[in-house]
Design a protein with these regions (language model features):
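Membrane-embedded transmembrane alpha-helical bundles that form the catalytic cores
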Residues: 1-297, 301-348
């Protein structure tokens, strides 16, 4: 199917194939909702991602001149650049498919709301995670080598610990493969692969200790404040991986992380320096407002399809919403003469 050939989602014939051979008569609702989703994707890509790219390129292109908080600012900007670029592309693809009456699998479910790394990968590039599990991880665990390894580890370390060690070994190869898939360079193998393996393994090993600490401190691990802290922690850990992903090399990534950890210059956030990173104050304000819109819609999506909720509004209201978004993209999007052609980052992987 032509829209998915460049950047996904990765389809599985047994789940998605039959619909390509079924008749799909014109359906006004499907066409309009598909176009609405495409518009939302263009908003993410042309209004947000392209603006974030200017900040990212300025800081990462000359990181030695932008130490400390600049590094964190550039990395957070890259997180949103990558997310809006990739998920925006998926919105365009899935929306286009919907106009033809086809339902493709979701590839993103608000990943920056994840409370741990495992959950993050169940929300980020979902089809890749499913493919890797089915065609790399499970076949590895069923292989003769891992079967023998599992038996040996269970004899030496006990049933529970032996199974855990075998699973961790399989996960190591899985995440190494994820890094290879992203490009094969060590910055991808570390930033998108092995670092996340380390996070997941560490989280599983430390979970009993974490729960005991929460119990001794009389803290409810399911409290809203705890959930917010876990979301912030997960976003922070993911951003460390993004430093490797975006840096020119592993060496540059280490230098940037060292600078981010040792130079304390939060004054740039309230001074004029922040408007010297590729966006003036007007463009920066547009970027912030657009991110707030994205955040608000993401919160609304947790309660169901936003398009369906808009569809329930009176006709003048729903048309006003979509026309405002359309003109927002037309007037504030980065496209046309004077701008670099918008590209989808994941086309390169």
């Amino acid at each position: 199917f032509f829209p998915v050939m460049v950047s996904g989602p990765i389809l599985r014939y047994r789940e998605d194939g039959e619909q390509f051979f079924e008749p799909h008569p014109f359906d006004y609702k499907q066409v309009t909702q598909g176009m609405q989703r495409m518009l939302w994707g263009f908003f993410k890509e042309l209004v947000i991602s392209e603006r974030m790219a200017l900040i990212v390129n300025t800081i990462y292109g000359n990181y030695e001149a932008y130490p400390g908080v600049y590094i964190w600012l550039g990395t957070v900007a890259f997180a949103f650049q990558l997310y809006t670029n990739f998920s925006g592309g998926m919105d365009i693809v899935l929306g286009l498919a919907q106009t033809f009456g086809l339902k493709l699998p979701e590839n993103f479910r608000r990943p920056f709301f994840s409370k741990n790394i495992s959950e993050y990968w169940r929300r980020w590039h979902i089809s890749l995670g499913v493919w890797m599990k089915e065609y790399v991880f499970y076949p590895l665990l069923r292989s003769s080598f891992f079967t023998r390894l599992s038996k040996d580890m269970r004899k030496k370390l006990g049933k529970k610990r032996g199974k855990q060690i075998t699973t961790f070994a399989g996960m190591f190869l899985l995440w190494f493969s994820v890094g290879i898939w992203h490009g094969g360079d060590w910055k991808y193998i570390i930033g998108s692969g092995l670092l996340h393996w380390f996070y997941i393994v560490s989280g599983e090993l430390l979970e009993p200790w974490y729960l005991k600490c929460m119990e001794k401190l009389h803290i409810n691990p399911k409290a809203r404040a705890v959930d917010i802290l876990r979301i912030v922690r997960t976003f922070f850990l993911v951003n460390i991986g993004f430093v490797f992903f975006r840096a020119s090399s592993v060496g540059d990534a280490w230098k940037m992380l060292k600078s981010a950890a040792t130079v304390f210059n939060p004054g740039i956030l309230i001074g004029g320096q922040i408007f010297e990173l590729g966006l003036d104050w007007i463009e920066f304000t547009i970027a912030v407002v657009s991110l707030l819109i994205l955040f608000g819609v993401s919160l609304m999506q947790r309660k169901g399809d936003v398009r369906e909720r808009i569809r329930e509004k009176a006709m003048p209201v729903r048309w006003l919403i979509w026309y405002v978004l359309l003109f927002y993209v037309i007037l504030l999007g980065y496209y046309g003469p004077g701008f670099s052609t918008a590209e989808f980052i994941y086309q390169g992987f």
